[in-house]
Regions:
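A short, structured beta-strand/loop element
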Residues: 20-59, 63-66, 77
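Negatively charged, low-complexity tracts enriched in Asp/Glu with abundant Ser/Thr
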Residues: 1-18
Length: 77
């Protein structure tokens, strides 16, 4: 089994942030995502770019997206 790497271990200058198509322009919460070649993903808030972002490795991000798509009750309001 390979050693788990830290998904935060990227140069922030190399991050290209993309705004979610589900984020509106109405001054609400806007989610931005940066994807890296190895599958890591960072998630941030474009209204507060200096706040810490979340980092997921490829397996974590895949599990998160699958849970959202399956309407997992842990992620529904």
């Amino acid at each position: 089994m390979s050693e788990k790497r830290d998904p935060y271990d990227h140069d922030p200058a190399s991050a290209t942030w993309v705004k979610s198509p589900f984020s509106g322009d109405d001054n609400g919460s806007c989610v931005v995502v940066a994807r890296f070649d190895n599958g890591d993903v960072w998630v941030g808030d474009d209204k507060n770019p200096n706040r810490p972002h979340l980092a997921f490795d490829k397996a974590e991000w895949t599990a998160f997206i699958q849970a959202i798509e399956a309407r997992d009750p842990r992620f529904t309001a």
